[in-house]
């Protein structure tokens, strides 16, 4: 079931264990961004695709940010499935479908994520060649279910392993119990304020829109701690909401039509009505309060 996205499962009582989704979710929680970065993702199988998709939704720290994601691997089919990737401004996605790169190019990146294969030896080979060829100063993250073996080869300072089997199993438990529960509470708050469909009757797209928002809360918490005002957090939350819809190929239209994937709120934050802005601000405040309970 690894190729079946959780977001395609309509039954709210069924959860699919996805290594790739868990891995991506846990990676960005463990190694969050603190400022705009130039990021290399080497390898673009399931893990790499999810690293990008989750990164686009949680790496929102400033309305004026500029992240650049360089994808080294064939993204042809991915772009066919996700036709609105050009709507991720102010961030940018650059595809290198051949998967090839000059080692010297890697010196310009702020982080390198190697996730091309589930094979430990393949990813280790890539990492070893990079470290041998150029004096990379940025963090190099290596996807491997056996992090202890890689650490013994390279030492703790040069390679940061993620995606260990033990960590992912633990992350899945946390996701089921905490993230889904937080998403449900968030939706219930919205329903109490504005009305709507009960959680159990939501389709998978809307249910996972709440999950995406709940995933973003760890980023929002860090921004709150730094004194980011609620209005800015609301704008970032709106950017996340738009990205979630664009990832699923929605477009803007004057009149919302869910069946045709058209929504009237797919506009920059400053173009929203004051009523819609208030909804975003109240949602941020409610989630902040929820985290203190």
Region roles according to the model:
Residues 184, 188-293:
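Protein-protein interaction and targeting regions used for scaffolding, dimerization, and localization
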Residues 1-235:
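Cytosolic regulatory regions of ion transport systems
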């Amino acid at each position: 079931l690894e190729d079946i996205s959780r977001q395609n499962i309509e039954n709210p009582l069924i959860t699919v264990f996805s290594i790739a989704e868990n891995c991506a979710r846990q990676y960005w929680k463990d190694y969050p961004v603190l400022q705009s970065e130039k990021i290399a993702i080497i390898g673009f199988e399931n893990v790499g695709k999810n690293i990008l998709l989750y990164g686009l939704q949680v790496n929102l720290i400033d309305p004026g940010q500029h992240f650049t994601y360089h994808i080294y691997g064939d993204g042809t089919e991915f772009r066919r499935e996700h036709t609105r990737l050009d709507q991720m401004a102010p961030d940018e996605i650059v595809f290198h479908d051949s998967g090839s790169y000059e080692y010297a190019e890697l010196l310009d990146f702020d982080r390198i994520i190697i996730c091309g294969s589930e094979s430990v030896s393949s990813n280790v080979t890539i990492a070893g060649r990079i470290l041998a060829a150029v004096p990379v100063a940025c963090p190099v993250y290596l996807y491997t279910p056996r992090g202890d073996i890689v650490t013994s080869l390279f030492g703790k300072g040069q390679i940061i392993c993620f995606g260990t089997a033990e960590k992912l199993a633990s992350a899945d438990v946390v996701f089921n119990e905490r993230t889904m529960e937080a998403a449900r509470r968030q939706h219930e708050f919205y329903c109490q304020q504005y009305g709507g469909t009960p959680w159990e009757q939501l389709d998978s797209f809307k249910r996972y829109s709440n999950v995406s928002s709940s995933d973003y809360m760890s980023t929002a918490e860090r921004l709150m701690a730094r004194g980011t005002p609620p209005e800015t957090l609301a704008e970032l939350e709106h950017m996340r909401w738009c990205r979630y819809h664009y990832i699923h190929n929605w477009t803007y239209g004057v009149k919302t039509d869910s069946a045709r994937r058209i929504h009237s709120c797919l506009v920059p934050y400053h173009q929203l009505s004051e009523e819609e802005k208030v909804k975003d601000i109240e949602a941020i405040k409610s989630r902040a309060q929820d985290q203190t309970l």
